[in-house]
Amino acid sequence: MHVRLTQIDGKLPNLALMKLAHWHRACGDDVYFTKKVERGMFEPNYDIVYGSAIFSHSGGRVESLLREFPDAIVGGTWRLDVITTVEQHLGLETYEQYDYSIYPHFDASLGFTQRGCRLKCGFCVVPKKEGKPRSVNTIADIYRGVWFNPTLRRDEPAPRHLHLLDNDFFGQPEEHWRARLDEIRDGKFKVCF
């Protein structure tokens, strides 16, 4: 199968698209990643097209993608009334495998140590989408260990640099956030929250 993954918005790598890339490649599918919503002149016909949008102001780009690919599956938090996860789409309870190769120049490890939020900010979808705060991953779960260096064209140890996407790091139980801080300190990680 030919699969198109489209990052509609956002500057950081999209975890949902990274999961889909991993899953489809594990199934033997050809995966094409782009941030363009319009079809390129030399793009093939696709068996399945995915789009992911985070922000509600991306509705116009979503519409453009759907004009180009009417059967595209568009997910993300851009629309509060329809929130589905990659796992729901794939019919799996959990799926935590990521294909970083669609972002060859991003060398940090990316993920969540907790999901949910105890705060109820009027503009935010997190409490509705994810519920109450809970711990989900250790630093060891998030750190990818090895990355393909596109400049040197070889695998190398991944830099000890993390982007934690947690919405409420200190909202998880204290013993968990303290354990994560110990892991960060002991592993000498640089962290961006």
Q: Which residues does each PLM region occupy?
A:
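Ser/Thr/Gly-rich flexible loops in soluble cytosolic domains mediating phosphotransfer, phosphorylation
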Residues: 72-99
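A short, structured N-terminal alpha-helical element that caps or precedes a catalytic domain
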Residues: 1-71, 80-81, 171
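Short amphipathic alpha-helix with an adjacent loop that forms part of the alpha/beta core around
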Residues: 38-47, 63-66, 142-155, 182
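Conserved acidic residues
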Residues: 46-49, 122, 160
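Residues that mark the start of a beta-strand
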Residues: 1-4, 30, 107, 120, ...
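Conserved residues at the C-terminal ends of beta-strands
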Residues: 6, 52, 75, 127, ...
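Canonical Radical SAM [4Fe-4S] cluster-binding loop centered on the CxxxCxxC motif
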Residues: 104-152
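Conserved SAM/AdoMet-binding glycine-rich loop
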Residues: 146-193
